[in-house]
From Swiss-Prot:
UniProt record, GO biological process: defense response
Species of origin: Olivierus martensii (Manchurian scorpion)
This protein's name: Beta-toxin BmKAs1
Notes concerning its domains: Has the structural arrangement of an alpha-helix connected to antiparallel beta-sheets by disulfide bonds (CS-alpha/beta).
Signal peptide: 1-19
LCN-type CS-alpha/beta domain: residues covered: 20-82
Job description of the protein: Beta toxins bind voltage-independently at site-4 of sodium channels (Nav) and shift the voltage of activation toward more negative potentials thereby affecting sodium channel activation and promoting spontaneous and repetitive firing. BmKAs1 also significantly stimulates the binding of [3H]-ryanodine to ryanodine receptors on the sarcoplasmic reticulum of the skeletal muscle. It also displays antinociceptive effect in rat models.
Molecular functions per Gene Ontology: potassium channel regulator activity; sodium channel inhibitor activity; toxin activity
SUPFAM superfamilies assigned: Scorpion toxin-like (SSF57095)
Pfam families: Toxin_3
Length: 85
């Protein structure tokens, strides 16, 4: 039984089950999903995108998501927003 559990854990490491943290990406505009103080909408949007927990990061006015796949997150390197909303 211990060997089976060990093999399962090793397979997760080899497969690369990885979740990241970051700002949610609006795939239509390429921008971050904006918010003001609405943690509930950010949390639901984060969970819809397979994240664990989301909240409105007030200083950046954008939804921050913890535990989401990288494909659902905005990245500075691939930023295509150019100020569009």
């Amino acid at each position: 039984m211990k060997i089976i559990i060990f093999l399962i854990v090793c397979s997760f490491v080899l497969i690369g089950v990885k979740a990241d943290n970051g700002y949610l990406l609006n795939k239509y505009t390429g921008c971050k999903i904006w918010c003001v103080i609405n943690n509930e909408s950010c949390n639901s949007e984060c969970k819809l995108r397979r994240g664990n927990y989301g909240y409105c990061y007030f200083w950046k006015l954008a939804c921050y998501c913890e535990g989401a796949p990288k494909s659902e997150l905005w990245a500075y390197e691939t930023n295509k927003c150019n100020g569009k909303m």
